[in-house]
Regions:
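Surface-exposed, active-site-proximal loop segments in enzymatic domains
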Residues: 26-36, 76-79
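Active-site-proximal loop motif in hydrolases
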Residues: 6, 36-43
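Active-site core segment of subtilase-fold serine proteases
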Residues: 1, 23-25, 43
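Short glycine-enriched loops at secondary-structure junctions
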Residues: 12-24, 64-70
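Second-shell residues forming the walls of enzyme active-site clefts
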Residues: 42-167
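Active-site-adjacent structural elements in enzyme catalytic domains
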Residues: 1-10
């Protein structure tokens, strides 16, 4: 029904589905708001691929988010830093892997999460190691990469646009 409604009003891109694995039910922006399909990454992958397929039937591009995974965070990146260095698991990539392997993923949206195991200096959205190394080279994704809102506090308060322009 969502895809049909979006098409009827002229929308052709949906920044959905959320493919974050519900690995932390207390996560203030994923778990507590029930934005995840499941704590089981395979279930998340299956549901997301179904949602994406239905959207495509209606001519709507979907955007899997939030890469590389926001489900294990204890904090909301809208209001501050969300460090997943000790909580993130490789299983959070499964929904992306399954869609990429099946050539069904058009676009992803980045997560402003910080993980020192990926990049000691930058959150996912600003990390070449995450976006080029992990997403493009390791996972083989060739589609569109969207940033989440750059005014979210996890980026704006720590990696403001002016400081990034100087790098």
């Amino acid at each position: 029904r969502t895809a049909r409604t979006l098409k009827s009003v002229g929308i052709n891109v949906n920044f959905a589905p959320v493919v974050d694995v519900n690995s932390n039910p207390a996560n203030p922006v994923i778990g507590k708001l029930e934005r995840s399909y499941s704590a089981d990454p395979e279930m998340v992958a299956t549901h997301a691929r179904i949602v994406s397929a239905v959207h495509k039937e209606h001519g709507i591009v979907t955007t899997f988010k939030h890469f590389p995974g926001h489900g294990s965070a204890w904090n909301d990146s809208h209001v501050g830093m969300a460090d997943v260095t000790t909580t993130w698991a490789d299983s959070e990539l499964i929904p992306y892997r399954r869609a990429i392997e099946a050539n069904e993923l058009d676009a992803i949206m980045t997560a402003h999460i910080f993980n020192a195991n990926f990049d000691k200096d930058h959150p996912g959205t600003l990390s070449k190691r995450v976006l080029t190394g992990m997403l493009r080279e390791e996972l083989g994704f060739e589609g569109v990469i969207y940033s989440d809102d750059m005014q979210m506090k996890a980026v704006a308060d720590f990696y403001g646009l002016r400081s990034e322009e100087r790098r």
